[in-house]
Amino acid sequence: MALRQCAIYGKGGIGKSTTTQNLVAGLAEAGNKIMIVGCDPKADSTRLILHAKAQNTIMEMAAQAGSVEDLELEDVLKAGFGGIKCVESGGPEPGVGCAGRGVITAINFLEEEGAYEEDLDFVFYDVLGDVVCGGFAMPIRQNKAQEIYIVVSGEMMAMYAANNIAKGIVKYASSGNVRLAGLICNSRNVDREDELIEALAAALGTQMIHFVPRDNVVQRAEIRRMTVIEYDPKSKQADEYRTLSNKIYNNKNFVVPTPLTMDELEDLLMKYGMMEEEDETIVGKTAEEEAAAATA
């Protein structure tokens, strides 16, 4: 099988890293050889696979060694559950430098050291998603990842972020093979959430590849720094992640998305009761003015 490179984007706090590690565990359980490249300064993209608080990052190790040229691949590449290879790009100290730069440095280092030449079926990039700056767009921009999955929920800001990421994909699709492969709904138990994300997916010209229900077993597994598939393999939630990984394995639906305008997105949110229609008459009115108008 030819190497498939997939990037997972999504708003911060949406459960992107948890979802990525659980679906990758499902793919590994089915016999696939996988590498995860964490592209988030928090360096939490591999903790459930390695049972670790946080993996040493390429940027940290390079700083200790003197430069990235002084590193060996085995210094930064660790194997975890199911033989999954794990790398974290890391970033600079808060307030110093560009975190996106760490992603660029890490991917270049992995290429030069032959990490992609190993017998791999999939590479997954777990990418910080509401910052669509050059560094974080690296997996898209340099044609590293061809399949982009966006983790989303029925919350307004998660949908705004998904639409912005779709705009980024359009920008780079014309010069390469990058395509939107689907939305993964990580449920927040919002009313009509599955319908809303199906509608958003249709508007973007893609699919909701899977609806992952909310289940407390995810948190119980996380406390133990494990994926659900490893912690409780017979649970319903483990089967949900297996279903998601199987859908990704068989996915052939790769599109150049059709992002929504802000008005279209707000219309969609209003249609599903996520947002009230704007009342232009109250814009700019203070509480005192509103009270005076109400008693007039």
Swiss-Prot record:
Post-translational modification: The reversible ADP-ribosylation of Arg-101 inactivates the nitrogenase reductase and regulates nitrogenase activity.
UniProt-listed Enzyme Commission number(s): 1.18.6.1
Membrane-spanning segments: none
Residues carrying ADP-ribosylarginine: R101
Top-level division of the source organism's lineage: Bacteria
Gene Ontology process terms (BP): nitrogen fixation
One Pfam entry name: Fer4_NifH
Enzyme class: oxidoreductase
InterPro entries (UniProt xref): NifH/chlL_CS (IPR030655), NifH/frxC (IPR000392), Nitrogenase_Fe_NifH (IPR005977), P-loop_NTPase (IPR027417)
Oligomeric and partner information: Homodimer.
Name assigned to this protein: Nitrogenase iron protein
Species, as recorded: Magnetococcus marinus (strain ATCC BAA-1437 / JCM 17883 / MC-1)
Name of the gene encoding the protein in the UniProt record: nifH
